[in-house]
């Protein structure tokens, strides 16, 4: 969301009006991002409705996501894998695997794309960044699984409705 400082107010609205709890909150000058979590999906959906209502917005006001770049890199070299893994925690890219780099705008939609990719293919999430102007994810796996994940992520983003972005 923009400006980033609005995240403080919006998280406050969501957690005080519902049973959802904050899961992430990142604030930058231009853009900010937040997540709410609950064991009940209804609580999370209610938090979204409450926030939109308080901001005077509806789902129709959202910006339609755009895929801005995709790269599929096959047979990752061991040295490149080492560079990519340097600051990783959790899943790592293994030499010989295939890597997908996908970027979209607005940034927050990358979380949705990643979720849809993980549902359809046996892949590893290496990196996801959903703050700033563009969201980015790096996935790894076999070439076939990465192509399946790529198609699922792109189809999911392209299926979302909204107004054209700025």
What residue spans do the PLM features occupy?
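Positively charged, small/polar-rich N-terminal and surface patches that mediate targeting and assembly
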Residues: 3-23, 27-31, 39-98, 106-114, ...
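Helix N-cap motif at beta-to-alpha junctions
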Residues: 37-44, 140-146
